Each structure stands twice: as C-alpha cells, then as structure tokens.
Swiss-Prot record:
Cofactor binding annotation: Binds 1 Ca(2+) ion per subunit.
PANTHER family: PROTEASE S8 TRIPEPTIDYL PEPTIDASE I CLN2 (PTHR14218), TRIPEPTIDYL PEPTIDASE SED3 (AFU_ORTHOLOGUE AFUA_3G08930) (PTHR14218:SF32)
Source species of the chain: Arthroderma benhamiae (strain ATCC MYA-4681 / CBS 112371)
Keywords of this entry: Calcium, Glycoprotein, Hydrolase, Metal-binding, Protease, Secreted, Serine protease, Signal, Virulence, Zymogen
Protein name: Probable tripeptidyl-peptidase SED2
Domain Peptidase S53: 210-596
Any single biological process term in GO: proteolysis
Pfam families: Peptidase_S8, Pro-kuma_activ
Localization terms from the record: Secreted, Extracellular space
Catalytic activity reported: Release of an N-terminal tripeptide from a polypeptide
Length: 596
C-alpha cells in the first residue's frame, strides 16, 4: 500500500511538471505538492490569471547602498531620502530588458492591453493556455483536503533562456495561499474592577494590570506630549484579512482613555479592492487595537488605515495547514501601491501586525517583498513589524519534507530592512513576555549594522541550541514594548488584547513622536531606523534583562497538531541585545538626546 501511494505521488508530480526544453530555464519549482493539497486535474485553458513579474536587477547593490547611505548617521547622504521619481530612476531596468520581456509576452499571445510596465515589475493577465506555453509548464487545479478550496497552480515554471537572467519571479504560480496567516493576537477577558478604573488610576498603575495610553505615556516618558499636525509626519497602519478599523470604537476608546484627543480620526487608503466596512459581525479586533493606540499616542498626526484585499501566499506547514481561494498577494499589492505614492503622500511610519513563518513563504517572494521594504526606507519610511507570538518557534520543524527539528523565524520581522518589535510585560522592572518571537533568519544574512551587538550575544549563548538556528542570519527583534493585556474597544465593549501586535503600533506612535521632535528642529524624519538604533540609538532604550521566551512544546500552538518538542526551548533576555526584546523598551526623553 505504501509503495502504491508513493508511485501515485510520483505520478502526480510528474503530471504537474513538463519536461524542460533546452531553450527554457527553470525559475522556480517545488519538489512536491505542498502538504494538505491534492492535484485533482488540469486547469481550464480559458481561466484568466493575473500575474506579477519581478525583473531581476542588474546591480541589486545599488538599492542596498542607497538605503544605508540615507539611513546611517554620519554619512554624507544621511536623511536625504529619495523622491519617488529618484527611486524609479534607481530601479529602472535598461530599456532593452523591459522590451525583451514585453516582446516575450506579446509574441506569446498576451494582449498588449493586458500588460502594465511598472519599471522593475511587469503585471500581465492571460489565460491558462497562453501562460502554459509562455512558461513551459502545466497549470493544474489543486484542492485543499481540509476545506475543499481549489486553486490553479503549478509546481514549476520556466522562461526562455534568452530572458531568464532578467526574471526574478512570476507569481501566482508556485504560491499556495493560506486561510489564516499567522498574526499576533491573544484576547483576555477583563475584570469589572479594571473596567471601572479612571484614566488617572491607569496612569498610576504603570501598566501592571492593564495597558492603556495613559500608562504607556508614563512608562515610556511621553508625558502629555502630542505630535503637531504636519503633512510630513504621517502614520500608516496596515490592514489585511478583512480586518476593519471601526470609527465608533475609536471614539469610545479616546473618550475613555485620551479625552484630549476626542474628535481626532483617521483616513482610509483602500488597496486592490480593500474595504473598511463599518459595523457587522466581521473581525475588527486587530485593526481596532492598532488604530486606537496609534491615534491615542500621537493623535494630531495624520493617520491612514491601508486596507488591502486578499490573503497571502504560503507553503503549508503545521502552523497554518488550511488554505484560501483568494489569488491576491496582499504584501505585494500594498507595497507596490505605497512605493508608487508621491513622497508627500507616503507615511513616515508604517506599522504592520501580521507575520508568517519564514519557511512558509517561497524564497523569491521574501526577497522581492523585503526589497520593497528597502525601497520604502529609501524614501524615509520607518517600517515597523511585530516580531510574532511563538517564542523561538511553534511547530519547530522544517516543511521541506525532511521534518527536521528547527526553530521557526518569522517574516517580515526577519527582513533586515524593517524594525522588528518584541514584547515585554510588567514594570519595575519590565520583563520579556514568554510569547515574544525572535531568533535568526534562515533566508537573510546578518546585516553589518548589527554585527557587534549580535556577536556579543552569541558569545554569551555559546553552543546552546546549536543546529536549531543559523547564527549568521539576520537577528530579530530589534527593540520591544509592552505586549500584554492592552485595553481595546471592540464592537462597543472593552476587552484585553495581548501580543506583539500590540507592541508594534505603540512603538510606531513613539517613532512618530520622535519624528515630530526632529521636524520641529528642521531635521528630516528618521526613515529606516536600524542603522541608527544599532550605532547610537540603543542607549535611549531600557535594557531588559529579566524573563525570556518559550516555544517548541511538542504541539503547534495554532493548529494543535503534534510537532517537534525541544525541552526548555527559549531565548533569554540578557544584558545588551537579545533575541526576545532586542535592545529593550523606549525612554522617550533619553531617545531625544541621542537622535542623529
């Protein structure tokens, strides 16, 4: 029976992969049908698919050199962030490169009206039959065995050798979407005594029982400071998975916790069919959490909720075995939208409280989106991400068919061009919260800006957890903030929310306050934060040396499926940088003294 199943599996894989011709080069391939999916038959030749094609840059170092030049204090170009037109010029491929790709598409049968040249990206729509010929592949219908959702995908695709050096990736092809991408969100019921506390009592509590804007202001030294209303200091809040920020809940929150901010609101940026529906039974907790703390801590800043339709492309692993039918790629949709905005419409801070295990995304996809975060950084955007809520890992095993024991880094927190925010709990002193994710990337090498700090930590760590992580990978998180039991109004009622999804918007608001401080003195916004944080800014953060993260318990915390167990798996908070709280939590007054 086992032999028969193995033979059938080989047959299905063979049916999904045509024999590559000598004139074509394979761009991407999967070794097997992802776990939880079954190939059920050939795709309808007339079915239409919308594709993204990322053009491989001839000199990728130009982008990286530029972001470090404008983001590293002491360099001549520091703070001289690019305009959109300057970024376009930096990334624009040679005319003959774009022409060769467009000619390949049109000669292959794609209607020229369905092709959009966006410089370093090309978007095109065509039917399955034409796409199969173009990419020397066979598209099939794959069914999710758990929820019967079907998708048109392939396990491998190629392009002509003549243009292969110019193609970084084409998607959706090998991307199998998820229904519930990992996000940081833990709900806690509130006791009646907490619900009845006054603003003054919350401030005096120093976040010991419930986190509010009042106690964060006290704990992190903001006092009653607010940002000024300026066009050059905007905050963007990312919304995915049909999460909608509710105006009525924000009004209730501000009335209760920030009375001086009553009447302040946010605008909407709706991307790729995104919505921000008010009322109704849909989920809104994450969106409300983000918006209430961003507006509450910096209420005069211009805040935009960027709602993007669609669900992300992931390769199934134990943490997220269920799939979705939406073909949109939300990060790509959002990021391509943002990098095309004029500089005066861009947020100076963008906070996002979503993430996926790094291994569950194809390598080409993580590289392409990480580069887009870098592009935002060159234009002066501080990109903030929550680090995740699984400690060193949840499933703690690889999804490459080997099922090897391995810690699970989180993406985009592991991208070297974002600032990753871990979580703390308690006061006097603050401690690392046990769920705060962190670790070392398996995709991105450690950037030079964090060499010294991470090497110091690795000396302390020694051989502990050897083989379970890549010590040469990009280390995260970078910094941290309170992450346990935030007061949030949702559907008219107050609840408690925990997770690094709470830490990220709180930190974003504090960064906006620092930008406001700099702008008032005639200096530009901070932009990409990490080179400053690791060179000098770290001294403005309170080092967290107590507590630690936990994970790898033998069961995946999201799916409940049995997984690898690593006894006592953890990252401990230590003196200096560590992979659970980074450099620690902000002290606003101290930070203003070490600004570049």
């Amino acid at each position: 029976m086992r032999l028969l199943k193995f033979v059938c599996l080989l047959a299905s894989v063979a049916a999904a992969k045509p024999t590559p011709g000598a004139s074509h080069k394979v761009i991407e391939h999967l070794d097997f049908v992802p776990e939880g999916w079954q190939m059920v038959g050939a795709a309808d030749p007339a079915a239409i698919i919308d594709f993204w094609l990322a053009i491989e840059r001839e000199n990728p170092e130009k982008l990286y050199d530029t972001i470090y030049d404008v983001s590293t204090p002491g360099r001549a170009q520091y703070g001289k962030h690019l305009k959109r037109e300057e970024l376009d010029d930096l990334l624009r491929p040679r005319a003959e490169t774009s022409e060769s790709i467009i000619n390949w598409l049109t000669n292959g049968g794609v209607n020229p009206q369905h092709i959009r040249d966006e410089g370093d990206w090309v978007r095109f729509s065509t039917n399955v039959k034409t796409a199969e010929t173009l990419m020397n592949t066979r598209f099939n219908v794959f069914k999710d065995n758990l929820n019967s959702v079907s998708k048109i995908r392939t396990l491998e695709y190629s392009v002509p050798v003549a243009i292969s050096a110019h193609v970084q990736m084409i998607q959706p092809t090998t991307l199998f979407g998820r229904q519930k991408p990992q996000n940081s969100l833990i709900l806690n019921p509130l006791t009646k005594d907490l619900e009845s506390m006054s603003v003054e009592e919350f401030a005096a509590s120093q976040c010991r029982s419930l986190v509010t804007t009042a106690c964060l202001r006290e704990l992190y030294g903001l006092g009653d400071r607010v940002t000024q209303a300026r066009d050059d200091n905007r905050i963007g809040v990312s919304g995915f998975l049909e999460e909608y920020a509710q105006y009525r809940d924000l009004e209730l929150f501000l009335s209760r916790f920030e009375p001086s901010a009553k009447g302040f609101n946010f605008s909407e940026g709706l991307i790729a069919g995104g919505k921000n529906t008010q009322g109704g039974p849909g989920s809104s907790t994450e969106a409300n959490l983000d918006m209430q703390y961003v507006v509450g801590l910096s209420h005069k800043a211009k805040v935009t909720y960027y709602s993007t339709a669609g669900r992300g492309p992931l390769i199934p692993d134990l943490s997220q075995p269920s799939q979705a039918s939406n073909n949109n790629e939300p990060y790509l949709e959002q990021l391509r939208y943002l990098v095309k905005l004029p500089k005066n419409q861009l947020p100076s801070v963008l906070t996002t409280s979503y993430g996926d295990t790094e291994q569950s995304l194809p390598a080409s996809y993580t590289k392409a989106t990480c580069d887009l975060f870098a592009q935002l950084g060159t234009m002066g955007v501080s990109v903030i991400f929550s680090s995740g809520d699984t400690g060193p890992g949840s499933s703690c095993q690889t999804n490459d068919g080997k099922n090897a024991t391995r810690f699970n880094p989180i993406y985009p927190a592991s991208c070297p061009f974002v600032t990753s925010i871990g979580g703390t709990v308690g006061t006097g002193p603050e401690r690392a919260v046990s769920f705060s994710s962190g670790g070392f990337s398996d995709r991105f090498p450690r950037p030079q800006y964090q060499d010294n700090a991470v090497k110091d930590y690795l000396k302390i760590l020694g051989n502990q957890w050897s083989g379970l992580f890549d010590p040469n990978g990009r280390a995260f998180p970078d910094i941290a903030a309170q992450g346990s039991n935030y007061a949030v109004y949702d559907k008219g009622r107050m609840t408690g929310v925990s997770g690094t999804s709470a830490s990220a918007p709180a930190m974003a608001a504090i960064i906006a306050q620092l930008n406001d401080f700099r702008l008032a003195k005639g200096s530009p916004v901070l932009g990409f934060l990490n080179p400053w944080i690791y060179s000098k800014g770290f001294s403005g953060f309170t080092d967290i040396v107590d507590g630690g993260s936990r994970g790898c318990t033998g069961y995946d915390i999201y799916s409940g499926l049995k997984a690898k167990k690593v006894p006592y798996a953890s990252w401990n908070a230590t003196k200096g940088w560590d992979p659970v709280t980074g450099f620690g939590t902000p002290n606003f007054q101290a930070l203003t003294k070490v600004l570049p």
